């Protein structure tokens, strides 16, 4: 062979080898992580999966999973950690068959023991301390581990345990390894609660906590071994979710405009049309999130029924809702919101100044008189409503003193109605969203004499307690009768003017064009939770 040809071939081979080595050894360009920033409007109050009963849901709903999910609007169940379930004829025994191959975030396997420990802990903490929302498991007498992937529940009275197993609180399953990591001697040991609430977690959900500052920011990272990725089939899901605490609505608006926020939960409603013009999108979620105005029934003069009715007849609720909510709410009726099981129409007071003056005269309260109203400081709609009510009551000689407070302080102040009612404001406005799709959730949590965490009226009435307890106990066997009992309970609250539902919120979530939020990412039972595993991030 010609030497020149050989030399040329050698050079070509050398060049190919060099190029191959360069391609092999050169730094690989990695795809930028998909990061979504979600602006949430309240500090996170806790992330203990058994006990948390407030704003921590926004985190719990992504990090943990229940046995089932339920959408009350569609009346539809979706399997989560359980794949199928059944009950005996009278609803006193339920069997759940669990999903196989599921891992907790620390790599330990999910099994029936985890379900037993999680359910019993939520139930027993509530039974012993009244904390959390573990009352939902009240009927559960025994949780039996049949085998690694089968759990049997034995109940003391019939219940729709499928609905309870899909609750937004007190139904999340955590890994038993958390007991070892926290140094807890038992599931009831406070050391476990402290471990959770310092930013640790033990869930199976699609995202894991990597950074936890409940007053400012929580960061979540995609859990690549989540069992559901093959079902969701969304390669464009966020790799990281940043939940940023932004309490001021105007700051959420500014963050969207600056490109610092991708999803905002609470921009000023007056600015929504402007944001749409700028290319932002809106997901309007019809919710079961309502705003309750409680009267402190343990303090003069709101301990007088006629005085409470005088105040209520000075509210033109249609006018007030339009003013405060800018079209993003439905006027309340009864305590249970529209579209929710047990809602009752016609339980709202009409504006009638003559009627108000009549009741004021019957109350024996001399005017001028001053009373206080407590509401959350960073909710613009409540400020607007409080100022509206202040103006109206001035017409009948009632001076309304405004007492806005941050949520954590407000809650502590409101609970004072039980220990120190004379120092607790006469009127308290607080919001509520459901734990389970039952009227009992609203009526028990906010008005039962045993529920002192959320009963801001200080209302105690054995007849009322008996009505709703009886209703809950027959829900699983005679649902029609249960609804009638719940209706009677709501009428009692209305007739005695203990509290009123001001409005049921339509929640606008504003988001940038770089993401897509499909319908399956939002479920009104799990308020403020965006299921980011369904969200698509454009790159």
Segment roles from a protein language model:
Residues 39-89, 120, 202:
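N-terminal lobe/hinge region of extracytoplasmic solute-binding protein
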Residues 41-60, 81, 108, 162-174, ...:
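A structural "hinge/loop" feature
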Residues 97, 134-184, 213, 514:
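Surface-exposed binding/hinge segments that line
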Residues 207, 302, 330-363, 377-384, ...:
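Structural transition elements
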Residues 213, 217-218, 222, 312-344, ...:
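Detector for C-terminal structural segments
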Residues 83-129, 146, 152-154, 301-303:
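Aromatic- and charge-enriched surface segment that lines or borders ligand/interaction sites
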Residues 226-273, 399:
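Ligand-site clamp/hinge motif
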Residues 71-72, 76, 168-236, 240, ...:
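Gly/Pro-rich hinge or "lid" segments in bacterial periplasmic/extracellular proteins
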């Amino acid at each position: 062979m010609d030497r020149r040809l050989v030399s040329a071939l050698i050079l070509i081979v050398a060049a190919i080898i060099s190029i191959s080595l360069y391609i092999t050894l050169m730094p690989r360009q990695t795809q930028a992580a998909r990061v979504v920033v979600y602006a949430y409007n309240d500090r996170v109050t806790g992330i203990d999966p058994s006990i948390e009963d407030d704003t921590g849901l926004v985190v719990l709903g992504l990090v943990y999973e229940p046995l089932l999910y339920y959408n009350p609007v569609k009346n539809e169940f979706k399997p989560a950690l359980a794949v199928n379930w059944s009950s005996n004829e009278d609803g006193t025994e339920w069997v759940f068959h669990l999903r196989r191959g599921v891992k907790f975030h620390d790599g330990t396997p999910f099994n029936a023991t985890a379900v037993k420990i999680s359910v019993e802990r939520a139930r027993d903490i509530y039974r012993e301390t009244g904390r959390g929302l573990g009352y939902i498991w009240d009927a559960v007498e025994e949780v039996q581990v049949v085998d690694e992937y089968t759990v049997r529940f034995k109940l003391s009275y019939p219940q729709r345990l499928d609905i309870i197993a899909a609750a937004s609180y007190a139904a999340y399953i955590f890994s038993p390894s958390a007991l070892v990591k926290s140094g807890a001697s038992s599931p009831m040991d406070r050391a476990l609660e402290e471990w959770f609430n310092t930013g640790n977690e033990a869930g199976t959900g699609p995202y894991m906590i990597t950074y936890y500052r409940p007053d400012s920011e929580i960061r979540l990272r995609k859990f690549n071994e989540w069992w559901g990725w093959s079902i969701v089939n969304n390669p464009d899901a966020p790799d990281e979710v940043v939940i940023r605490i932004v309490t001021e609505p105007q700051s959420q608006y500014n963050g969207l405009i600056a490109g610092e926020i991708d999803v905002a939960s609470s921009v000023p409603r007056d600015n929504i049309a402007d944001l749409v013009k700028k290319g932002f999108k809106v997901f309007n979620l019809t919710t079961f999130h309502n705003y309750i105005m409680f009267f402190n029934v343990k303090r003069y003069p709101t301990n007088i029924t006629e005085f409470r009715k005088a105040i209520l007849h000075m509210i033109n609720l249609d006018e007030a809702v339009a003013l405060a909510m800018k079209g993003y709410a439905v006027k309340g009726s009864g305590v249970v919101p529209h579209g929710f099981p047990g809602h009752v129409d016609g339980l709202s007071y009409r504006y009638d100044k003559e009627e108000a003056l009549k009741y004021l005269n019957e109350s024996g309260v001399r005017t001028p008189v001053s009373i206080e109203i407590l509401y959350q400081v960073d909710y613009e709609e409540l400020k607007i409503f409080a100022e509206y009510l202040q103006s109206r009551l001035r017409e009948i000689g009632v001076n309304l003193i405004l007492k806005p407070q941050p949520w954590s302080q407000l809650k502590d102040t409101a609970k004072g109605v039980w220990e120190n009612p004379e120092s607790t404001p006469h009127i308290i406005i607080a919001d509520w969203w459901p734990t389970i799709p039952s009227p009992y959730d609203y009526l028990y949590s906010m008005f039962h004499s045993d529920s002192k965490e959320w009963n801001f009226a200080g209302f105690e009435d054995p007849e009322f307690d008996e009505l709703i307890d009886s209703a809950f106990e027959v829900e699983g066997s005679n649902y029609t009768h249960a609804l009638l009992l719940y209706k009677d309970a709501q009428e009692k609250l209305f007739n005695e003017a203990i509290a009123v539902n001001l409005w049921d919120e339509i929640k606008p979530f504003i988001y940038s064009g770089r993401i897509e939020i499909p319908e399956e990412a939002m479920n009104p039972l799990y308020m403020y939770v965006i299921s980011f595993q369904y969200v698509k991030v454009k790159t």
